[in-house]
Amino acid sequence: MGKSTGKKVMKNEDGDDCDGWWWLVHKNIGASFLCIAVFAFLVRVAVSFHPYSGAGNPPKYGDYEAQRHWMEITLNLPAKEWYRNSTTNDLNYWGLDYPPLTAYQSYVHGLFLRIFHPESVSLFTSRGHESYFGKLLMRWTVLSSDILFLFPAVFCFVVVYYTGRGRRSDIAWLIAMILLNPCLILIDHGHFQYNCISLGLTIGAVAAILSDKELVACVLFSLALNHKQMSAYFAPAFFSHLLGKCLRRRNPILEVSKLGLAVVGTFAIVWWPYIHSMDAFLGVLSRLAPFERGLYEDYVANFWCTTSVLIKWKRLFTIKSMKLLSFWATILTCLPSMIQQIWSPSNLGFLYGLLNSSFSFYLFSFQVHEKSILLPLLPASLLALEEPFHFRWLTHYALLSMFPLMCRDKLILPYMALFALFYLLYYAPGGREDTRKMQSPSSLRSFMLSFLVLCSLFLHLVYITLHPLTSILSSLKQ
């Protein structure tokens, strides 16, 4: 299915040679992408009018306040103070716990807010700031991040990977599945985060690898790692694929060295304010690995949380033991696809390796929260044309796993709307041909699918029914 590594020229459906630009014009993909991108942008705008994490809920509010507070800190304090506990930077109040690139992003967005609404990022006095204009500016920072990072990266991936093959309607369907992923929209534009930046950088790195620009890929993926450390979910796939390609070249040691220098150089530039002092360096590292939070957070649909109903992991094992257990479980489940890519690297195998690697981390790694499902969803979205059935059900249950968070953030209305929109687009007339064929499966398969959908609806109803009751009981205990 995938293009062979190093293939420079593709064939179109008529067998003629073509390049990316010819394909874009001939298939009119550029116009399709623009229309879908505009619609995806408007959907994001609509979702952003709804509440966000911790809205009107003092004293610590939620992720919205965390992002605003990081802008306040990075704007008003020198870089060496950003990760250090002090009288001006209380790390117990939403202290920075992401790598330096997130801090730089917060600084740039803070400059934008200070120009138009300085009181929203003033030191100390802006805590819990929730003015209408401040919220509007904050929402625009996420929207602009999507436009600058995610949208161009998706376009590059489609051009690089699908040039010369595939029907126009299939490509348009794939673009819609990626740009209108309901989970990402709800987390970034509802709950309030900037996952679009790290995911956009990762997609850009994938596109660079598929076009044999390994040095560019190393820089982009290093930037993704330095924006959100959870991008390490993809690291085994990148490492094994690039190593496999290097080993097949004339001078493998030189090739590996070049890629290593690109990674080290990128990290050195990003970490420059902190590499001059071991104390400062270790201080940042300690903020990036919050093991004290425990094995998992909230209602995360991974192995440890699911099996905790029967096996009380947190009671039976110490944190140190669980760290080792989760580490080896993650490594062992990543290993098959890593070995395959080192032995026989291919573009399609690389995409499946990304899926396997990210799922291994999501299911078995230490300290996973419900928003981490966005990471395995990314390669699943990129593979939606190859695996439409599995992509649909992964998205379905990813949304279901996020439902408690959406209830807590009062985002049930956009949750239901995006759930419906996803299925409308998935089965859209003229969309992916395989999806229409699957509308009439075998009787057993049809029964199982219907049963699973009913179970999902039942779980939604149970949670909505019981959640108010648990809130009342907890308030009575207090």
Predicted feature locations:
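Membrane-embedded helix bundles of polyisoprenyl
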Residues: 40, 152-160, 166-207, 214-230, ...
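Membrane-interfacial catalytic/cofactor-binding modules of polytopic membrane enzymes
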Residues: 64-116, 121-144, 181-202, 251-380, ...
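Start-transfer (signal-anchor) and selected internal transmembrane alpha helices
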Residues: 1-51, 155-162, 166, 171-172
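Alpha-helical transmembrane segments
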Residues: 31-44, 146, 175-176, 262, ...
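Eukaryote-specific detector of the first structured module of a protein
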Residues: 31-34, 44-47, 61-63, 73-78
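Hydrophobic membrane-targeting alpha-helices
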Residues: 45, 108, 152-160, 208-209, ...
